[in-house]
């Protein structure tokens, strides 16, 4: 089996792991209703995207579950 010839230094180990950092999810305000939504996604509360209504929320009261396209 292959075995490392030298011990990996903490600096090299850190440089290798520098791309593994986690970032939190970004949220923006819906321009129609003011609720928080993901950027570039349809608002789950009112169904608007980019100033237009693209989906109507069903009567279930659970956001866009059972979406009806407009």
From Swiss-Prot:
InterPro entries found in the cross-reference section: Ribosomal_bL32 (IPR002677), Ribosomal_bL32_bact (IPR044957), Ribosomal_zn-bd (IPR011332)
Lineage top rank: taxon: Bacteria
Keyword Acyltransferase: no
GO biological process: translation
Keyword Ribonucleoprotein: yes
Alphabetized GO MF terms: structural constituent of ribosome
Coiled-coil zones: none
Record key words, sorted: Ribonucleoprotein, Ribosomal protein
Transmembrane parts of this sequence: none
Biased composition regions of type Basic residues, renumbered to the chain: 1-19
GO CC term (a single one): large ribosomal subunit
Listed Pfam families: Ribosomal_L32p (PF01783)
Family statement drawn from the similarity comment of this UniProt entry: Belongs to the bacterial ribosomal protein bL32 family.
Classification via HAMAP family: Ribosomal_bL32
Name of the protein described by the UniProt record: Large ribosomal subunit protein bL32
Taxonomic classification: Bacteria, Pseudomonadati, Pseudomonadota, Alphaproteobacteria, Acetobacterales
